[in-house]
Amino acid sequence: MIFTILKNKNDKIKTLVLLCLSSFGILAIIFNLIAWNSPIEYLPFHMCNINALLIPIALITKNKKIGNLLLLWSVGALIALIVNHSAANFELLSITFLQYYLSHTFEFGIPILIFALKLIPLDAKTIPSTLLISLCILIVVHFINLGLNKYIEINDLRDWKGDLIVVNYMFTIKPDNPALQFFYNLIPIPFLYVLPIFPIFTIYLLLIYTPTIIKNKKDI
């Protein structure tokens, strides 16, 4: 429906509307930092959080590498919508329910709309940079996990249940859903178990860009 409304509008209107919709992701980050009295567990280092922060940058700058990166990173929001079991416990139409599902829906949908509305062109040449940037961010986030967990242990920081807090951004420490559990069963080592996902990412990106690659060859 959003695509139908915007497809004949000029680029400024398209960008402005998508920027407004992307604010749900930013507001969700702020909400989680404030609402649960444990901001260290809700820092914006998950894949979908980083995606939420990158969407406005891509929309404002029209940067091709960032825009094409979003196509891969939006998958994190889709996975969160499908397999996050804790979200199933949210009270229907509560603030928590709405901020979670609205923000993740837009974090998945806006990157698709960016390309469908031709605000940024699809470019298969960005596949290497997308994979390299993703790997670098994953490495950085893993070290953030290690550093924060050491800080938590030293300062004995505990959650509302009295358990020692363990941060697990981007799930580099341990799996949090059946899909990641499969890879952890193959390689039961923190961080390393996530790496076999990159060949899958590569195949996913090739499938997305194949029509563009074929079209470009025909145009030559």
Question: Can you describe what each PLM-predicted range is?
Answer:
Residues 1, 44-54, 70, 101-109:
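Membrane-embedded alpha-helical segments of multi-pass membrane proteins
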Residues 1-31:
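Alpha-helical transmembrane segments and their cytosolic membrane-interface
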Residues 2, 55, 106-125, 138-139:
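Alpha-helical transmembrane segments in multipass membrane proteins, preferentially the mid-helix core
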Residues 5-16, 60-66, 117-128:
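Membrane-interface helix-boundary motifs at transmembrane edges
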Residues 15-17, 43-46, 67-74:
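Cytoplasmic-side transmembrane-helix entry/capping segments in multi-pass membrane proteins
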Residues 23-33, 73-86, 134-143:
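Aromatic-anchored segments of alpha-helical transmembrane domains
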Residues 33-42, 61-64, 85-99:
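Membrane-interface helix caps and helix-loop-helix hairpins in membrane proteins
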Residues 129-132, 150-205:
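Membrane-interface transmembrane-helix boundary segments in multi-pass integral membrane proteins
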